[in-house]
Regions:
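Long, well-ordered, tryptophan-enriched scaffold segments
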Residues: 181-185
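Conserved phosphate/pyrophosphate-binding and hydrolysis machinery centered on Walker-type P-loop NTPases
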Residues: 31
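Cofactor-binding active-site loop characterized by glycine-rich and histidine/acidic residues
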Residues: 34-173
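N-terminal hydrophobic or amphipathic helices/low-complexity stretches enriched
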Residues: 1-12
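Short alpha-helical functional segments enriched in proximate histidine and acidic residues
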Residues: 19
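Globin-like tetrapyrrole-binding proteins
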Residues: 27
Length: 185
């Protein structure tokens, strides 16, 4: 008998492959290869799928937005309100599951991503905001703001100028709470 982790990773891969095949369009590499990374992130993050705007939630940014089926499979399996029909309508006009994640369209998406590297810059901005809020509101013994921002990016993201600028900015702030979870695939 396989364990729950492997079954879930396999489900992410199968859902992604089925939706991409049905749409006859999409990028299967990232959701198939990064399924274990997505599973590990989501099983260790703080979030509430019934309240996706919960202030102290951890943020997951898929910078390599072309691999959006990874996001959608995770949102489906972790109860964010997507249906199997939503998954099978991947890349269809008017669908919640567009070719790139769109903020405000699909529950759970933290920011729209498309241009490579953009998600890294968004994650750095979110981490700066988190750091500011933590310094303003946290008191000893009362960590009101203590969430994390996680960015999953591909090699294409790391080759863009926007990533270099964002990484330079992040380095200048010496983030302690924004652990650089920039997985290079």
């Amino acid at each position: 008998m396989q364990d729950v982790k492997q079954l879930t990773v396999n489900a992410i891969r199968v859902l992604s492959a089925e939706a991409i095949q049905k749409a006859n369009s999409g990028h299967p590499g990232l959701p198939l290869g990064a399924a274990p990374i997505g599973y590990a992130a989501f099983t260790n993050m703080t979030f509430n799928p019934k309240d996706t705007a919960f202030d102290n939630r951890d943020r997951f940014i898929l910078s390599a937005g072309h691999g959006s089926m990874l996001d959608y499979a995770l949102y489906y399996l972790f109860g964010f309100g997507l249906t199997k029909e939503d998954i099978m309508n991947f890349r269809q006009l008017g669908s919640k599951t567009a070719g790139h994640p769109e903020y405000g369209v699909c529950p759970g998406v933290e920011t729209s991503t498309g241009p490579l590297g953009q998600g890294i810059a968004n994650a750095v901005g979110m981490a700066i905001a988190e750091d500011y809020l933590a310094n303003k509101f946290n008191k000893e013994g009362f960590p009101i703001v203590d969430h994390y921002t996680i960015a999953l990016c591909g090699d294409g993201c790391m080759q863009e100028g926007i990533e270099n600028e964002a990484a330079s900015l992040a380095g200048s702030y010496f983030f302690l709470t924004w652990f650089p979870s920039l997985f290079i695939l």
